[in-house]
């Protein structure tokens, strides 16, 4: 009996050690990432230079030392000015920004996409011949390597000359058309998609290396197709992006680390499914909680948080011959101006040696930043837990009906409008506007559901028209609030564009209803 007792005691102690081990595994060393950075998306909702400088100063005060800028068509290309759009910065503005950031100890790393996500280049006749698919325009053909190299050598050289940073981010993510056209398909079938991808990115990386810089590329495609990874220069740094999914979502990270590749990490504070009318706050808090410890434990050298203004997917207005008349982002997020709390959550996660507790962080932030009581802090936390639900073809993805979604959002609106901050009220005003924009969206969808009802007839417009007219009036007030809150943060043209994007479908519905006459 004594033997059995000792065995049971031993098993109990082993079990306790396992429990303690699991608990202590949550406490990780505060590895001082070489670069603690922010990845700023300037493709859409384009910020003013003054706003970027102010933001740079703030993140520097928080302890960040790197700012990655994805310009797309807002960069003032020297020899390829065709690419630069109507809200592009001037070269003197970029130089001023780089100099200012350096004075704060912040290094600016430029992004120059060279494979996928190049709609902003391929939309132009000057470059369209490089497309994998002329009807898509999102990706260059990797087998047109000579012509591709001539273009991107110029673009990389421009970035290298402007930016003193040792690094150039060359993109390479989400190349969904890989092996799409006949020539590439035949190559992929014979040699594999990995070699098709790596052969191209190898050439792009070597161009950057010859410029005396270190290439950084997104890791998703090389993780998905790792077979030819050894052909890629080992100087190339792989940036693993994880916005809330399980590790190794794209592929085996350890395999590429064993091959000698260095990794940087990237979490997110604005990403899918975020848009104008919903923010998945809880996913973003959990993302910082889970991914930063993972990156530390895997030995990632640097850590960044991304903030996406859009998905990077676009809708086009085409003319005959696949000529592009217009290009619009499919998804627009609320501007970065409303997300300081998530930036702070990311920074706090970098500083501490245990995973972020989202609720405790929000309560502390509410007290320190807004002067809120614990009760109001808890209410703010409740607001962030609203399910990020949208509608698909007029139907809620989870709720029973639109009215239920409106009632849920009304609770959030009521809380936010009752909260009385003692400091930094502008930040609370952004939260209020987000909730009111969701209300605008839901009421539009409710009106649209009535418009699409099986019994909607020409006489039905008389009942629906007053509600839509009221919605248009509400939209104008929301536009005014949005313009006021983002004046000086976004470029004026961007403010007008974002208001127009939100209002367009409501105004279209109004015009149709007014035109319906017996």
Language-model features, listed with the residues they occupy:
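A ubiquitous, low-specificity "background" feature that marks scattered single residues
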Residues: 11-12, 47, 179, 226
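Substrate-binding cleft of carbohydrate-active enzyme catalytic domains
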Residues: 31-219, 237, 245, 257
